[in-house]
Amino acid sequence: MIRPHMSFKLLILALALTPLCAAAESHNEWTTNDGQLILQGVPKIPSDLVGRLKHYQDVRAARFLAWTDNGRGMYIRTRFGDTSQVHKVQTPGGARQQMTWFREPIGQVVRRPGSDELAITMDRGGGEQDQIILFDPVSARSRMLSNNDSRNRKPLWSPDGSLLAFQSTRRNGRSNDLWLMKVNEPENAELLLEAPAGSWYGPVDFSRNGRYLLVQQFWNVDDSRIYLLDLNDRSLRMVAGSTENPSANRAVSFDRRNGGFYYITNTRGRAAELAWQSIEPDTVPQFLTAGIRWDVSDFAVSDDGKRGAFVTNEEGISRLYLLNTKTRRYSRVRKLPVGLISGPRFHPDNDRLAFNLSTSQTPNDVFVLKLGRRTERAGALQRWTYSEVGGLDTSDFAKPRLVHYPTFDFVDERPRTVPAFLYEPEGDGPHPVIIRVHGGPESQYRPAFSARTQMWVAELGVAVIAPNIRGSSGYDTDYLAMDNGYLREDAVRDIGALLDWIADQPKLDENRVAIYGASYGGYLVLASAVHYSDRLRAGVDVVGISNFVTFLENTEDYRRPFRRFEYGDERDPEMRSFLERISPLNNVDRIDIPLLVVQGRNDPRVPASESEQIVAALRERGRPVWYIEALNEGHGYDRQENRNVYEQAAILFFQKYLLN
C-alpha cells in the first residue's frame, strides 16, 4: 500500500526559487492532450508531481445502472480509460466487462423491458446537446433514436418496450417538451406536451397497464408539479402541486396496482416527505414518513409492489429505510457503512435491493442488500464492485467532522449557524486552509469520497472545510431561499463569517487561506476575492460566473428562465442595476489575490466568455492569473486526461500561492 505523504518540500523549494512574474505568466501558453487543453500562465507540470498524484488520479468509482434481463448480473457505469462507459458484472466482486466503447462519456442509461438493449444519452464535447442511442450489448451495435440537432434527455421505456417517452427541445431549440416515439419508427416521434415558457416537462413512469404516464413539471426549486397523462385520449390532469400555493413535488413512480403513485413533497412546509396518492380525482396525499424530520432523497418500489426503500439526508449523511407498502410500517437498515446512498433499485425477484454507497474513505461502489421474509426487514449486505484506489492506503484518509459556525444574522435572538464539513491533516498545526464551496446554488456539500480533497489534505498538509452556506438544499425551504435575488451577497457574508471562525481555531492558520469553487461556487470564489482579498491568499474558480448580466444573457435559452428565478431577472432595470453592482467583473479592481481559472469551451450553462472576461480584466491590471481551457469539455471536466492536468496545476498553484 502507498501511504500519502504530507508535503512536497523539495518541490515547494524549487517553486520558490523559480522567478515567475505576473507578466510572464500571462503570456506563457502551452497545450497538451492533443491540443485540446490550453494552459496560459501555468508552469509546466514537473514529472515527479505527475507521478506523485497518479495514485489519487487513478481512483475509480462505479454506479449501478440496471439489472440484466435474466437477473443474474447488472450493468454499471465506471471508467477504465478516459471516459465512463457501460460495464457488466455477473457476480459479486466479479470482473467488470466493458460493453460500450464510445469516445464520449455516457449519460443516462435505461434497459429496455424484456431485453438487454439499452437506451443511452450522450452529448459531444460537454455541450449537453444529448442524443438518445439504442445500444445492443450482444451485437455491440448502436443506432440513433433522436434527431441529432436538439437536446434529448430522460428516456423512459413503456412496460412492453415498444415506446420511449423522452424530453426534447426539438420543437424550437429551447423548450423542454415531452415527446413519445415508437422505437421502430423514431422518425415519427409525437409531441405530447408543449412546456409553457419558464418550465419543463419530463416523463417519470408508465402505469403497469400502459394507459397512464406520470409527468413531472418543473418551474423552479420552490414550484414543481405532477400530472397524469391519459395516453388513450391525451387528457392531462394535475395531481400534485398548485399554481396558487406552490410547493416542491417530485414524482417517483406508480404503485404496482395502477391505483396510485408515490412522490416526494414539501407541501406541508417542512422536510421533503414520502407520500402516496390515489390517481382518482380530488384525492389527498397520504404521508408515509411523517415521523422523520429529514428530507427523503430517494425512493424505489419493488416489482410486486409489496416493498419500498427510501433514503433520507440527515445533515449530509444518508440513512436507508425499508417500507412495508401495505401496513406503511418502515424500519431503518442498520449496520451499513456511514456515507452517501443513492439510486436504490429492487431486483426483479423482489428479494434484493441494489444501491450506490460512498464513504469518506471508499469510492462510490455498488452494494446489494438481501431482504428478509418480513417486508421491512433486511438481511446480509453484499458488495458487488470494488473500485480501485490507486494503491493508496485509504485507512489513512482524513475523516470529515461536522461543525457549525456562527454567521452574521440571528434566529430567535441567537446567531444563525452554518453547517460545514472539516477535513484536517495530522499534527497540531496551525494548518493552511482551503475553503471548498459547492455549486448550485440549490445544492449541498455532502461527505462523499473525494480523491481531490484527500489529495489536498495529505499532499499539501492543508485543512479543507466545505460549508453549506445559505441557499444550500437539504435543510429547509427558508434556508434554501435565503440567497435569492437581492439577498445574493448574504451568501458571500457567510464566507466572511467562516473566515472569522477560522481565525478562532488554534489548529487553523488564518494567514494562509485559499478558496476553491465550481459553477456558482466559482462565482463565490470571485466574490470572496472582491470582499476578502486581505484575508485570502489565493482562489481557484472553475466555470464560474463573473458577471450575472452577461451570464443570464448568454446561458442557453432552455436554462435562462430557471436561472432568472434564482439570481433575478436582468430585464428588470432595478434588478439589472443590482446584478451589475455585485458582479465580480465590475469590482475587479478590488481583487488582489492570485487566481487559477478553469473553463470548458463548450459550456452551455456558464459560457466560456464568463471566464475569458475575468481573466482579461485581471491581466489588464497585472494580477497573477493562471488560465486553463479545454476545447472538448463543457460545464466541468469529464475526461480523465483533462481532469488530471487541471488537478496537477491546482496543486502547483496552491503550493506557490498558499503554502509559500
Residue ranges of predicted features:
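N-terminal secretory signal peptides that target proteins for export/translocation
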Residues: M1-M6
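Bacterial N-terminal signal peptides
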Residues: K9-P19
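Boundary at the C-terminal end of the N-terminal hydrophobic targeting segment
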Residues: A22-S26
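Beta-propeller blade-edge and WD-like acidic-aromatic loop motif
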Residues: H27-L49, T78-Q98, E117, T121-M144, ...
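Conserved beta-propeller blade repeats
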Residues: D58-R77, R96, R103-T121, I132, ...
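Generic beta-strand/beta-sheet core signal
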Residues: Q216, L229, I264, Q277, ...
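Cap/lid segment of the alpha/beta-hydrolase catalytic domain
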Residues: A378-A380, T385-S519, H531, L552-R563
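Active-site-proximal cap/loop segments of hydrolase catalytic domains
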Residues: R414, P467-N660
